[in-house]
């Protein structure tokens, strides 16, 4: 139980496509969205490929690219985008404005994620930075990177897997009674 609270990706949900199909069938009053939460080191190379700066990163792979996704709306990314644009491909990243300032990251730079895969293997993955954001949540987005879930799955060897699956009412209005009933 304690390990599962830390959301390590070696305890990820597998076969999420089928899980989501089942959830949609059993709970049609909700829509479902997978997420991968992960952390590691972000390395920013200079023009020679040598480390210019690096620091810890808390990253989230969310569904930014599929046609029916509402994550851009839920995260209010159109309103919270400071520089650049939203990702258009699975390997593009948004970096929090605070992290960009701390690591001297500019839109157009490549950020190399260094971490571990779902199978605890070492991984590095290059993410072009296409934009910066500010969620206006204080420390919550201090070290944050957002990428499409398909890019996170590729970088972390998590094909058809996720850390968690979130359910939302179609109106995006939170109803505590419905949430408690669903949990029970």
Where do the language-model regions lie?
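A structural signal for hydrophobic secondary-structure junctions
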Residues: 10-160
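Structural beta->alpha junctions
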Residues: 2-9, 134-136, 167-176
């Amino acid at each position: 139980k304690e390990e599962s609270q830390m959301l390590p990706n070696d305890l990820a949900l597998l076969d999420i496509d089928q899980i989501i199909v089942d959830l949609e069938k059993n709970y049609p009053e909700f829509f479902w969205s997978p997420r991968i939460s992960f952390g590691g080191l972000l390395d920013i190379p200079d023009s020679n490929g040598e480390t210019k700066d690096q620091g810890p990163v808390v990253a989230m792979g969310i569904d930014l690219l599929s046609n029916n996704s509402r994550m851009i709306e839920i995260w209010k990314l159109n309103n919270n985008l400071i520089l650049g644009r939203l990702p258009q491909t699975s390997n593009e990243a948004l970096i929090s404005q605070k992290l960009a300032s701390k690591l001297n990251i500019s839109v157009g730079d490549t950020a190399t994620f260094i971490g571990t895969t779902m199978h605890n293997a070492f991984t590095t993955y290059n993410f072009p930075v296409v934009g910066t954001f500010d969620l206006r949540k204080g420390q919550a987005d201090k070290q944050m990177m957002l990428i499409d879930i398909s890019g996170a799955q590729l970088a972390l060897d998590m094909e058809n897997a996720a850390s968690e699956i979130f359910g939302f009412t179609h109106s995006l209005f939170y109803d505590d009674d419905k949430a408690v009933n669903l949990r029970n």
